[in-house]
Amino acid sequence: MGNGDYGFTRNAAPPDTNGAVGATQYVQWVNESVAVFSKSTGALIQGPVAGNQLFQALGATHPCAVNNDGDPIAQYDKQAGRWVLTQFSVTGGPPFLSVRCSVNHFRRQGNF
């Protein structure tokens, strides 16, 4: 992934490919794009979308919502049954670490 597969584009080097396996899904993050796949079938469920879309609830001018600076980390907390996704924001101001946690094990639009 990261070489045009499933709509991922490689726009930086290295591609900073990162992923995690959850209860029913696999989350793949390649630099600035994130996608969700079915763990059982491998089918694309959502995305790829720009990683900063995960942080739009912070407001249109918040650096985490505006910047999509990459170096993502996708993790699944098996004990809590939640996804934890991070990326940094360093463009145009002080650095931020953008962190988003899911409300349950099923990653989909709106449940982060």
What spans do the regions from the language model cover?
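C-terminal PAP-associated
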Residues: 1-112
